Amino acid sequence: MDKKTRLSASDVKLIRKETTHQGYFRIDRYNMRHRQFVGAMGPEISREIFERGHAASVLMYDPDMDLLVFIEQFRPGAYAALSSPWFKQDGSPWLIEIVAGIIEDDEDPGDVVRREAVEEAGCTVDELELISHYLVTPGGSSESMFSYCGRVDASDVGG
């Protein structure tokens, strides 16, 4: 394959897709083949993909007080990670995070972070600037994240 040729979605052949688990989250199994860098199609592979939708997050900043606003939440995944020797945090499933929320169908990501900022931190976002839109863990999930920086007044925020 020519070094200047870029591979794209048209270089993937979906053979089968099936839902293997449907609960709070969904897991789909994809059987597919994809073009390799040498130009030929590779063998069939099977991969499970964690489907949880898409999310939006906001790093809240108060420029008048020169403060960042974070929240603390219990996370089941962090609890499960406590059994791993690779999880070297403080041993707590309560994490310090930026505000985030799941994007519902036909919902604007900016509206999600404005709503979540009020619900989770009691902050109204005055200005919002998109930092990036990216895939969170593309090796095993289709989830994408819209990350913003938002101007807030943190003078009434507790914690």
What are these regions (language model features)?
Residues 1-16, 21-24:
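Alpha-helical and coiled-coil interaction segments, frequently adjacent to or embedded
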Residues 13, 124-131:
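A short coil-to-beta-strand element that immediately follows conserved catalytic motifs
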Residues 47-50, 64-115, 157-158:
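Conserved Nudix-box catalytic region and its N-terminal flanking loop in Nudix hydrolases
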Residues 67, 127-128, 144-146:
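Conserved active-site beta-strand-loop modules that form the wall/rim of enzyme catalytic pockets
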Residues 107, 119-122:
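Alpha-helical hinge/cap motifs
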Residues 23, 32-37, 137-158:
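Active-site-adjacent beta-strand/loop module that shapes the phosphate/pyrophosphate-binding cleft
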Residues 22-65, 73, 77-83:
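Acidic, metal-coordinating catalytic segment for phosphate/diphosphate chemistry
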Residues 17-20, 133-137:
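Short, solvent-exposed loop/turn elements at beta->coil junctions and helix N-caps
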